[in-house]
């Protein structure tokens, strides 16, 4: 080892100094610097590891214990003067001459002594001092990296044993240098003054090339001697960073300092989500492996979506242009062009996978004759969707009829053909945008017959239909007729006016549109025109074909309930390829619309609306946006049609939305809808299907005005998506309304039979509910007997699992006292006959006790006393207790109002009740909803006397009106019979 030298190191700035000592008198070892924290004051001042302390602030360390030395250091205040002894031959590791060390303040990075001064002059006190104002001792900031050296030095800390001695043969710098990537570990003992200078100078540039790292750098890896708290790095820029090594990233700082900058979870999650989205988007759009399954699937799916969305003529005046792929608005068409021209090369960038493109191209060949470049046109029709052809047709029409519209939407280009885009833009898309203003626009595109191969596209329209659900199966055959793409602007009424009777047509179109796409588009057109059967000038564009399937009746369009067969649009519009069906043609041929065949079923009026929506709003946004939207909007290519697919009956909907409102005077009077509502959202859903059934019956356009039945009749097609208006007589017999929304239209109690899927579901539900109705003691007539045999029997009466199964409440728990127990439940109707249980003694209305759970369809909700069973003797209940309490362990039963004599309520042993299962009201349960005579039987639950009150289903409303509480306290352990 080289000669030892004494160096005076002055640290300023106050603790923590950033070094550690080991040894001491107690260990009979000299006090030695075991570790220097990088970027600490000690490191900046030039203190080095393995330096032996000779004196601390002038106090000799010869006999100092470690603790004494520490206390001296701690007491040093803002300046610590250490006299240390270090090996002179350490070279770069050696501390630079005091002068050099003084230079340490980064400003003098290059000032250090010439390389010749590897061995610093023996301590010159004060020579090593870090600037007093420096935060450097803990300033671990990026600013530290400002020094030139910084750039050179990697930030990676070097890890060395704190006391690792330099091998005698090798210069210490070598040992340390191995750590620093930039500098080779020179074996030069201490010679390169550059190393030293580097040590002294913040920028080690001088010797950066191969010079050993500065002493500071060497020290950096080591932690300070001081206790942890002193080691906390200061976050903040250091005006004169000595070297990169002395600086660290904020992340490192935060870790070291355990600084957790509070970043709200929300911010974190947002950042993560953004990152993920970007990653996913980049992986999907510029996939490293374009042929990976995920990418291919994604592209295929995107193509499929485009097939059905592009048709939307990008109506949104270019807004729609937003690409799912993130391609610029008009890029859709451009993309398609590229895809077609470059299909294979574009695999990554283009929407189409090369394999998929290949297939599409092959298919496109058949359609090539369509008049679009076989590469482009064919693919577009196949890949992009008939939209391209449609656009072509529309473009032709638009050229004549919708040029003004053209400017509205150059975005039409989106649809696959860049070439066509201008005309296309002129054509449908503008129309789409304009359509609302001009409801009459006839199907713009004379269906350009797809190539005979076009048949394939037809299915696509079907798909549209499927998503739009505008058509009833019946329509399918006629759908070609509906082909006419009539844009009925969302302002359908105006459209109707202009069209004359056309508006009614939409319902017909539904039928005609039928989901069935014309298998042969080419031939389909002619047939479609005839189907239109309306003078509507069939756009002779031949294939009215399946395009019509795309039509989505615009619910907004008031169609005559009769489904006035005003031709929604000329079949020709439909003829426009199946794609055409997608595009909105309304604006293009306003006159045509009147032409549209009158056939109610055939009139596809809504399609234009849907088309319109698609095209107008058709702002296709990035894939991610689409995904984001998907959560709210289930449909991939939002059929913007307003027709309610199975939208709940408006009445039901209003009921559901108004659950919180007080029930209208009487449950029965409120009408079936109200009652259904009382049943809870779930029940409403069931009712809804019934409504849906009626909807199907009703022509899509059928306004509420038409009698519910009328709407059913007029539309032959009875689109599945009848206007949400499908009337449901609210007042119709309770049973009628409740049992069967459809029946309500009929207005006959019989409808309770429930027709259609909705009815079945409802009946099922009701039969199941009957089991749970607790009217009287579970008697022989117990729940097992359903109201009316439901078309599809549901679970056997034995089925008893309650929807709310949880641990039973504590025995002492009285639900009535629970803060959550609705007041309504506490106050039961006074009218309770005192007759035997068999008598319609109203047990707590299931709904009452369940009012706070309106969403659950519980048997109690259906208390229909169609056929009140003979009051069975109350099994365990007091014989004449008027009050029947359902014991739902988890729902608080509402005690019957004392209005009825407070006959002691008999609580059955807990075993008697299933969790959350009310004791059956056999009377109510037995009454089948379907029974046409709901009025005769007053629901026991509602009326004081079972027959006196019309069937009333308690509404899930909270009301404190009933104050009578039963004398008995309900105990969860006991079942109430």
Swiss-Prot record:
Family to which the UniProt record says this protein belongs: Belongs to the synaptopodin family.
Keywords assigned by UniProt, alphabetized: Actin-binding, Cytoplasm, Cytoskeleton, Methylation, Phosphoprotein
Segments forming domain PDZ: 6-88
One GO cellular component, as annotated: Z disc
InterPro entries found in the cross-reference section: PDZ (IPR001478), PDZ_sf (IPR036034), Synaptopodin_domain (IPR051976)
Gene source species: Homo sapiens
Biased composition (Low complexity): 216-226, 530-545, 572-595
The protein, known as: Synaptopodin 2-like protein
Biased composition (Polar residues): 194-203, 510-525
Encoding gene per record: SYNPO2L
Residue list for modification Asymmetric dimethylarginine: 921
GO function term, MF aspect, one: actin binding
Segments for region (Disordered): 91-226, 317-352, 364-677, 697-802, 922-950
């Amino acid at each position: 080892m080289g000669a030892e030298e004494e160096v005076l190191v002055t640290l300023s700035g106050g603790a923590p100094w950033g070094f550690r000592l080991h040894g001491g008198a107690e260990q009979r070892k000299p006090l030695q610097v075991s570790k220097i924290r990088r970027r600490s004051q000690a490191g900046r001042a030039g203190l080095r590891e393995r330096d032996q302390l000779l004196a601390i602030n002038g106090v000799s360390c010869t006999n100092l214990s470690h603790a004494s030395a520490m206390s001296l250091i701690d007491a040093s205040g803002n300046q610590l003067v250490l006299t240390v002894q270090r090996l002179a031959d350490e070279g770069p590791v050696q501390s630079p001459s005091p002068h050099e060390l003084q230079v340490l303040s980064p400003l003098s990075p290059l000032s250090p002594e010439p390389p010749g001064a590897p061995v610093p002059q023996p301590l010159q006190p004060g020579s090593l001092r870090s600037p007093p104002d420096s935060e450097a001792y803990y300033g671990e900031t990026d600013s530290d990296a400002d020094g030139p050296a910084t750039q050179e030095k990697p930030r990676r800390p070097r890890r060395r044993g704190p006391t690792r001695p330099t091998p005698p043969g090798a210069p210490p710098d070598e040992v340390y240098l191995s750590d620093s990537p930039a500098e080779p570990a020179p074996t030069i003992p201490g010679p390169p003054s550059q190393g030293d200078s580097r040590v002294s100078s913040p920028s080690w540039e001088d010797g950066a090339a191969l010079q050993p790292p500065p002493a500071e750098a060497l020290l950096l890896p080591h932690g300070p001697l001081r206790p942890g708290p002193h080691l906390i790095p200061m976050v903040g820029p250091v005006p004169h960073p000595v070297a990169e090594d002395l600086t660290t990233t904020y992340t490192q700082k935060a870790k070291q300092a355990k600084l957790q900058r509070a970043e709200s979870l929300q911010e974190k999650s947002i950042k993560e989500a953004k990152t993920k989205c970007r990653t996913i988007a980049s992986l999907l759009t510029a996939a490293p492996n374009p042929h990976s399954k995920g990418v291919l699937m994604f592209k295929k799916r995107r193509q499929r979506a485009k097939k059905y969305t592009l048709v939307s003529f990008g109506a949104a005046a270019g807004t729609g242009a937003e690409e799912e792929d993130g391609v610029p608005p008009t890029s859709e068409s451009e993309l398609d062009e590229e895809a077609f021209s470059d299909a294979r090369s574009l695999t990554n960038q283009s929407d189409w996978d090369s394999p998929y493109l290949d297939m599409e191209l092959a298919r496109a060949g058949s359609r090539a004759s369509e008049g679009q470049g076989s590469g482009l046109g064919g693919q577009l029709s196949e890949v992009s969707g008939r939209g391209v052809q449609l656009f072509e047709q529309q473009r032709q029409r638009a050229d004549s009829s919708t040029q003004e519209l053209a400017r509205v939407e150059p975005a039409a280009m989106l649809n696959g053909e860049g070439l066509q885009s201008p005309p296309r833009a002129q054509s449908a898309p503008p129309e789409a945008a304009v359509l609302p203003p001009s409801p009459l626009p006839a199907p713009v595109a004379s269906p350009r017959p797809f190539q005979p191969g076009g048949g394939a596209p037809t299915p696509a329209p079907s798909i549209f239909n499927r998503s739009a659900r505008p058509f009833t199966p019946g329509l399918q055959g006629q759908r070609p007729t509906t082909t006419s793409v009539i844009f009925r602007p969302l302002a359908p009424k105006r459209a109707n006016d202009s069209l004359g009777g056309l508006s009614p047509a939409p319902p017909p179109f539904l039928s005609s549109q039928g989901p069935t796409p014309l298998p042969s588009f080419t031939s389909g057109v002619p047939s479609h025109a005839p189907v239109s059967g309306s003078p509507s000038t069939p756009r002779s564009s031949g294939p009215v074909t399946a395009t019509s399937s795309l039509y989505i009746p615009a619910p907004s369009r008031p169609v005559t309930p009769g489904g006035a067969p005003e031709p929604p649009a000329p079949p020709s519009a439909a003829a426009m390829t199946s794609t055409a069906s997608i595009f909105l043609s309304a604006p293009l041929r306003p006159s045509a619309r009147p032409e549209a065949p009158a056939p109610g079923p055939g009139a596809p009026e809504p399609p234009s609306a849907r088309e319109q929506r698609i095209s107008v709003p058709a702002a296709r946004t990035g894939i991610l946006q689409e995904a984001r939207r998907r959560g709210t909007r289930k449909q991939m290519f939002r059929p913007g049609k307003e027709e309610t697919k199975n939208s709940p009956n408006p009445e039901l909907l209003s009921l559901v939305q108004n659950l919180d409102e007080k029930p209208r005077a009487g449950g029965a009077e409120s009408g079936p809808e109200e009652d259904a509502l009382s049943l809870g959202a779930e029940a409403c859903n069931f009712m809804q299907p019934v409504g849906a059934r009626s909807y199907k019956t009703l022509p899509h356009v059928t306004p509420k005005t038409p009698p519910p039945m009328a709407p059913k009749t007029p539309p032959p097609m009875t689109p599945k998506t009848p206007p949400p208006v499908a009337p449901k007589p609210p007042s119709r017999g309770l049973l009628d309304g409740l049992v069967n929304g459809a029946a309500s239209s009929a207005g006959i109690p019989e409808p309770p039979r429930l027709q259609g899927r909705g009815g079945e579901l409802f009946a099922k539900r009701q039969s199941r509910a009957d089991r749970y109705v607790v009217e009287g003691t579970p008697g022989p007539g117990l729940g097992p007997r359903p109201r009316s045999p439901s078309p599809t029997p549901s679970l056997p009466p034995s089925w008893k699992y309650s929807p709310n199964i949880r641990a039973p409440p504590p025995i002492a728990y009285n639900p009535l006292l629970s803060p959550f127990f609705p007041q309504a439940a506490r106050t039961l109707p006074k009218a309770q006959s005192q007759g035997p249980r068999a008598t319609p003694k109203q047990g707590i209305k299931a709904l009452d006790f369940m009012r706070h759970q309106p969403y659950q369809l519980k048997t109690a909700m259906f208390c229909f006393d169609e056929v009140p069973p003979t009051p069975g003797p109350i099994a365990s209940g007091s014989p004449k207790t008027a009050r029947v309490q359902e014991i739902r362990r988890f729902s608080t039963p509402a005690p019957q109002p004392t209005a009825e004599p407070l006959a002691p309520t008999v609580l059955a042993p807990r075993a008697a009740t299933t969790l959350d299962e009310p004791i059956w009201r056999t009377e109510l349960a037995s009454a089948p909803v379907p029974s046409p005579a709901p009025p005769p039987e007053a629901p026991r639950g509602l009326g004081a006397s079972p027959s006196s009150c019309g069937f009333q289903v308690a509404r899930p409303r909270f009301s404190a009106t009933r104050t009578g509480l039963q004398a008995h306290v309900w105990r969860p352990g006991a079942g109430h019979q």
